[in-house]
């Protein structure tokens, strides 16, 4: 008894020891916020340009203890108004305007060591760029401030004046030039008020040598940068009457540019529309047409990629698509630009290597092409495993396949099979010496005891000796009160199964069509319910899974095609009717957290959330 008790306790204790302690906690927890703070601070520190990102809200969090504490986090961020180079933290920044602010979602795993130390183990952020300000041609509010395009020509005199103003009023040793205009606004008054935000970059021109910017002054990638916001008033005579400027300069840290690695003789990618490819492509298509034994010329349709390599000359490696044209080789001496592509012609995928020796004026092209195949239609019969290997049997010119035999496809399949069309079909089956066992469709041997009155033999879809109700071709043994009658006068004769089997079925059957259908369905369900019954297809091959490039039209779907799938009767309160989930459903009512700050005056504790789920009220509207 003690041994049983110990085993019982061990069986209850071992599963709890093997499971990792993981639980969902409140997104507004203080430790969760510290973990997100560490993750967001690390992300902002890795960016060197633009503005910092500010926390919007925490959406998911889970804590794992094994043995250290790990937080699995998912949080949303928005672009703030503080540059990365500023000394502010993300908590001191405000959100940027919604139309101009980038957004993102981050997934991070943060470890907690000790009581206060948080370290980021892994983090991935997906950033969505801002849509930018909406620029319209007309505004309903005359005299209101409205955004304008950053590429507007009206900004050129204002920006030119602003750059000159900055260079004349700063003590920096070098001149600065405009880098990027970020946003601009304008207001129509007695003239125009402009407000422009832009970035500047240090150039290679020092103030000792240059008093103003010249075309020789170029921006330095490793120089200082800055961001300015200017306000200017332009009067009706297009003169700048007032101007104010506020700039933040960000000195670059000591940085040594690593030497670029030179690879002499390595292939370098070139644009597919480069003019340098005209000569190699012309030699490639000429080589293709000379070696191809087709009756029509080919021309290049699309260039996929191209590289050039410096060897003893130049080596071009080009991948392109060539298509057959309407110009025949018999009536045209060479390919011309007037030759149009034949949309129904052959398509080739080509790899070309062209060696160009400029000093010898020689070109050595090599072209290797393969015809492009079309997507094949896969067909799998009911109950056939998708993991079974398929061998595609190809013939010259096309792929020969046959569809699986079903209740609606024997006539079409037999007509497409030329080997079976010639000569009479002997026996009661689809092939000599083969026996088909398919219960439920009248194929194969089947015994059924019934309360019928006689011994019926009916002709139908079945072939071979079959004993059943319905459309079976053969004998059916029944135990009843009447005499045994043999109504199958044609039984024992050789039939071609392509003959109108429905007509013979109706002539030999003494029951109504409704009774026949009812008995057939009853037989189908009972036969499918028998255990250990094998379903075999004597003429089925793996190639039946592959359809031809130009498949024949299949007959329309009818209700008899659904006889492959039995109707399983289930009670509403049975276990088969109710689905039992493998794992308990988890809910997280404590997430997402409240927004960190209000967005455009929205209360952070109350947020309107759009729901795209289906509502029953929608069906009543």
Curated annotation (Swiss-Prot):
Pfam family, one: Cystatin
PTM annotation (Phosphoserine): residues: 331
Region described as Disordered: 396-497
Keywords, in A-Z order: Blood coagulation, Disulfide bond, Glycoprotein, Hemostasis, Inflammatory response, Phosphoprotein, Protease inhibitor, Repeat, Secreted, Signal, Thiol protease inhibitor, Vasoactive, Vasodilator
Principal location class: secreted
Listed InterPro entries: Cystatin_dom (IPR000010), Cystatin_sf (IPR046350), Kininogen (IPR002395), Kininogen-type_cystatin_dom (IPR027358), Kininogen_Fetuin_HRG (IPR050735), Prot_inh_cystat_CS (IPR018073)
Post-translation changes: Bradykinin is released from kininogen by plasma kallikrein.
Tissue: Plasma.
Domain (Cystatin kininogen-type) ranges: 27-131, 150-253, 272-375
Glycosylation sites: 47, 87, 136, 168-169, 197, 204, 398-400, 406, 512, 520, 524, 536, 548, 553, 570, 581
Signal peptide start-end: 1-18
Biased composition (Basic residues): 444-492
Role, per record: Kininogens are inhibitors of thiol proteases. HMW-kininogen plays an important role in blood coagulation by helping to position optimally prekallikrein and factor XI next to factor XII; HMW-kininogen inhibits the thrombin- and plasmin-induced aggregation of thrombocytes. LMW-kininogen inhibits the aggregation of thrombocytes. LMW-kininogen is in contrast to HMW-kininogen not involved in blood clotting.
Protein name, per record: Kininogen-1
Organism, as annotated: Bos taurus (Bovine)
């Amino acid at each position: 008894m003690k041994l049983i008790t110990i085993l019982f306790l061990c069986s209850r204790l071992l599963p709890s020891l093997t499971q990792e302690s993981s639980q969902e906690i409140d997104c507004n927890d203080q430790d969760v916020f510290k973990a997100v703070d560490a993750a967001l601070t690390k992300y902002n520190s890795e960016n060197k340009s633009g503005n910092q990102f500010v926390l919007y809200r925490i959406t998911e969090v889970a804590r794992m203890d094994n043995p250290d504490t790990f937080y699995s986090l998912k949080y949303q961020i928005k672009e703030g108004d503080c540059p990365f180079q500023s000394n502010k933290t993300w908590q001191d920044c405000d959100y940027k305007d919604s139309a101009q602010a980038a957004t993102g979602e981050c997934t991070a795993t943060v470890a907690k060591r000790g009581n206060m130390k948080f370290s980021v183990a892994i983090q991935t952020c997906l950033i969505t760029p801002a849509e930018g300000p909406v620029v319209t041609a007309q505004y309903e509010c005359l005299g209101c401030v409205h955004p304008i395009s950053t590429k507007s020509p009206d900004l050129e005199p204002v920006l030119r004046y602003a750059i000159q103003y900055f260079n004349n009023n700063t003590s920096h040793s070098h001149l600065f030039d405009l880098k990027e205009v970020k946003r601009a606004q304008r207001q129509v008054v007695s003239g125009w008020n402009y407000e422009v935000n832009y970035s500047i970059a240090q150039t290679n021109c020092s103030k000792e040598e240059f008093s103003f910017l010249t075309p020789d002054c170029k921006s330095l990638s490793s120089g200082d940068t800055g961001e300015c916001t200017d306000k200017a008033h332009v009067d009706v005579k297009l003169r700048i009457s007032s101007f104010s400027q506020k700039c933040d300069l960000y000195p670059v840290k000591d940085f040594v540019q690593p030497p670029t690695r030179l690879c002499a003789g390595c292939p370098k990618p070139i644009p597919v529309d480069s003019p340098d490819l005209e000569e190699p492509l012309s030699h490639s298509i000429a080589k293709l047409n000379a070696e191809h034994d087709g009756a029509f010329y080919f021309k290049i349709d699309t260039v996929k990629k191209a590289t050039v390599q410096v060897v003893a000359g130049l080596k071009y490696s080009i991948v392109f698509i060539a298509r057959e044209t309407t110009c025949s080789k018999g009536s045209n001496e060479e390919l011309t630009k007037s030759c149009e592509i034949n949309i129904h012609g052959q398509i080739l995928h080509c790899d070309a290597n062209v060696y160009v020796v400029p000093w010898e004026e020689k070109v050595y092209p090599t072209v290797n092409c393969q015809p492009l195949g079309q997507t094949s239609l896969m067909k799998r019969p009911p109950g056939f495993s998708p993991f079974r290997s398929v061998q595609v049997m190809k013939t010259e010119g096309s792929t020969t396949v046959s569809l699986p035999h079903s209740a609606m496809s024997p006539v079409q399949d037999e007509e497409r099979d030329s080997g079976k069309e010639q000569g009479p079909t002997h026996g009661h089956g689809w092939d000599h010496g083969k026996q088909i066992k398919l219960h439920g469709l009248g194929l194969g041997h089947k015994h059924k005891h019934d309360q019928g009155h006689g011994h019926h033999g009916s002709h139908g879809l079945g072939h071979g000796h079959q004993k059943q109700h319905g459309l079976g071709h053969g004998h059916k043994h029944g135990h009843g009160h009447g005499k045994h009658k043999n109504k199958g006068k044609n039984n024992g004769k050789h039939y071609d199964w392509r003959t109108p089997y429905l007509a013979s079925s109706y002539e030999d059957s003494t029951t109504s069509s409704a009774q026949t259908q009812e008995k057939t369905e009853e037989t189908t369900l009972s036969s499918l319910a028998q255990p250990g019954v094998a379903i075999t297809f004597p003429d089925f091959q793996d190639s039946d899974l592959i359809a031809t490039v130009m498949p024949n039209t299949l007959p329309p779907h009818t209700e008899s095609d659904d006889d492959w799938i039995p109707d399983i009767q289930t009670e509403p309160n049975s276990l088969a009717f109710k689905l039992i989930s493998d794992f308990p459903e988890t809910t997280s009512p404590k997430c997402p957290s409240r927004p960190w700050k209000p967005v455009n005056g929205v209360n952070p504790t109350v947020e309107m959330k759009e729901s795209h789920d289906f509502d029953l009220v929608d069906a009543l509207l």
